[in-house]
């Protein structure tokens, strides 16, 4: 247990279980060769009561024969590019359904940009590609953000009002991206 700037926090050290072969994070195939060991990542996990929980994760880089390259071993509790555990990311996304990004950031004591990026990745996963089947008439509108200084172009199904696509700006180039 360590004392952080805002209160108590707990650092858990995690090391690979050498009884098991590492698995490629990209293709999920078992690795025959460990490329390098002793790499570290610090991940934020869910709080335990009033204590922040941090994981000091030691991981290996492997040579994946299927991907034909060096890859990071798969960690079942964390995504390769994130600095929070999957359950912390899910918690943040669930809070964002009913709270503002700033309120969530204050609650979990993370940077608002981090909270927004986590929520955005879940939204893209859940709602990423919209099907265009059955569309007959499109409606195009623009909405102002921040009192008219920035705009979003919105493309909708005219009959249902379902949002098909959104893009930054209100120019021809924005619509061309659609």
Q: Model-flagged regions — what are they?
A:
Residues 20, 111, 159:
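A generic "binding-loop/recognition-motif" signal
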Residues 116-178:
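RNase H-like nuclease fold core
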Residues 74-81, 163:
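Extended, low-complexity cationic-aromatic segments
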Residues 12-14, 24-27, 64, 92, ...:
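Mobile genetic element proteins and their domesticated derivatives, centered on retroelements
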Residues 1-75:
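Short, conserved DNA-binding cores of transcription-related domains
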């Amino acid at each position: 247990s360590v004392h952080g700037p805002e209160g108590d926090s707990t650092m858990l050290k995690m090391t690979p279980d050498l009884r098991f072969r590492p698995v490629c994070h990209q293709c999920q195939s078992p690795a025959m060769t460990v490329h390098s060991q002793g790499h570290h990542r610090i991940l934020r996990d869910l709080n335990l009561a009033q204590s922040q929980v941090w994981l000091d994760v030691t991981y290996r880089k492997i040579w994946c024969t299927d991907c034909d390259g060096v890859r990071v071993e798969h960690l079942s509790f964390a995504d390769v590019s994130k600095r929070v555990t999957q359950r912390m990311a899910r918690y943040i996304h669930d809070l964002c359904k009913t709270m503002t990004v700033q309120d969530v950031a204050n609650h979990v004591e993370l940077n608002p940009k981090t909270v927004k990026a986590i929520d955005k990745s879940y939204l893209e996963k859940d709602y990423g590609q919209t099907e265009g089947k059955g569309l007959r008439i499109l409606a195009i509108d623009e909405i102002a953000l921040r009192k008219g200084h920035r705009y979003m172009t919105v493309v909708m199904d005219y009959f249902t009002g379902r949002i098909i696509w959104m893009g930054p700006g209100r120019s021809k180039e924005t619509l061309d991206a659609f």
